[in-house]
């Protein structure tokens, strides 16, 4: 007789998940986009390594986040609370992505920026995973997953680039 409650529970879960899929929002012209053009720098070569080369180059967490589109736990990343001046580079290919002048405290536990660095190294793609539609943030040079961008950020852009620390390498002005 235990089968009936289990079957009922599975049916309820199926209805809930199915309803969420049917009620999802389709991307519109108002889907968030970077404040600057999301194109690779002129003359910048695309970086492409084998999966094994990425595993050899990156830590396990960096690999999981950047190559497998993972997410680190909130309030655990190296840079979520860093207030130093400098530039955040892609941990995979070292191009500049975000400036500390554009970083702000969003309360989310991840580094958050309201704008991207100049150079066109940050791009976006539609992410349809986990029964929702979000805008994924990627490195235009090596296609690394960086995080997601949302439309709940501060002025002047109204955007919140929510980025995984594991996808970043911070460089102070003296290290550039």
Predicted segments with their positions:
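Secretory/periplasmic and organellar redox-cofactor proteins
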Residues: 1-58, 149-176
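A short Gly-Trp-Pro
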Residues: 46, 55-61, 65-89, 95-176
